[in-house]
């Protein structure tokens, strides 16, 4: 199992150009990672943004196969080793239809550069903005917070680049519509088993979108 820190988060580097904090860049990064690991079977489990990356990988894989099919090559050569293929896909709390209001709310949360004097205060703040995550035990909230906050300068700050919010805040309605069309095309191109997971109170993946999927 490989669980990477996407660019700008955790132990991964921050990008000098915040405009690159977007799904196309993440898909490119993950395709490179997959090429390095090259698993015999690729099962992608994606929550929220991770699911969008999975859909992006699926779309990229389809384009690669189409391009290869149209490109003649000499007989007898082995299949190319860069044949990216998803064997299974889990989409948790995400789908091809984007909720602009929710994404703007997420951008606002990401942009807030809050610092807390104690870890307990950081956990309390995280619980307040994460109520739609559902019920968790105190121990589970603490464990989640340890992946989100890091001790820095005598306080606790979130372990990611605040500039992650820049591309989200700059999006316009037309861009969202174009993005949705691409995501639906990627979803329709899937030729592997797909598991869709939706929480009862999710506002990122609506019941209507889940039903359409």
Give the role of each language-model region.
Residues 6, 91-94, 201:
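Active-site loop/turn elements of alpha/beta-hydrolase fold enzymes
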Residues 9-12, 97, 204:
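Active-site loop signature of alpha/beta-hydrolase-fold enzymes
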Residues 46, 50, 54:
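Gly/Ala-rich beta-loop-alpha elbow adjacent to hydrolase catalytic centers
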Residues 12-18, 101-102, 207-208:
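Conserved catalytic-core motifs of eukaryotic protein kinase domains, centered on the activation segment
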Residues 107-112, 121-135, 146-149, 172-175:
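Helix-loop "lid/cap" segments that line or gate small-molecule binding pockets
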Residues 78-121:
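Flexible "cap/lid" loop of the alpha/beta hydrolase fold
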Residues 149-213:
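Conserved serine/cysteine hydrolase catalytic core
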Residues 2-45, 59-60, 64-82:
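Active-site loop/oxyanion-hole signature of alpha/beta-hydrolase fold enzymes
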């Amino acid at each position: 199992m490989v669980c990477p820190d996407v660019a700008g988060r955790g132990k991964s580097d921050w990008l000098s150009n915040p405009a690159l904090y977007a799904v196309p860049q993440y898909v490119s990064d993950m395709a490179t990672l997959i090429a390095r690991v090259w698993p015999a079977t690729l099962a992608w489990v994606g929550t929220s943004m991770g699911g969008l990356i999975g859909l992006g990988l699926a779309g990229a894989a389809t384009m690669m196969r189409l391009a290869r099919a149209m490109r003649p090559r000499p007989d007898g050569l082995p299949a190319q080793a860069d044949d990216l293929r998803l064997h299974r896909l889990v989409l948790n709390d995400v789908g091809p239809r984007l909720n602009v209001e929710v994404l703007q709310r997420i951008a606002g949360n990401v942009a807030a550069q809050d610092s807390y004097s104690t870890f307990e205060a950081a956990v309390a703040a995280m619980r307040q903005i994460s109520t739609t995550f559902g019920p968790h035990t105190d121990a589970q909230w603490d464990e989640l917070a340890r992946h989100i906050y890091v001790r820095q300068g005598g306080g606790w700050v979130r372990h990611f680049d605040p500039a992650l919010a820049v591309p989200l805040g700059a999006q316009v309605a037309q861009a969202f519509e174009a993005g949705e069309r691409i995501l639906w095309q990627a979803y329709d191109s899937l030729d592997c088993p797909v598991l869709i997971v939706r929480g009862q109170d999710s506002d990122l993946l609506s019941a209507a979108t889940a039903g359409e999927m």
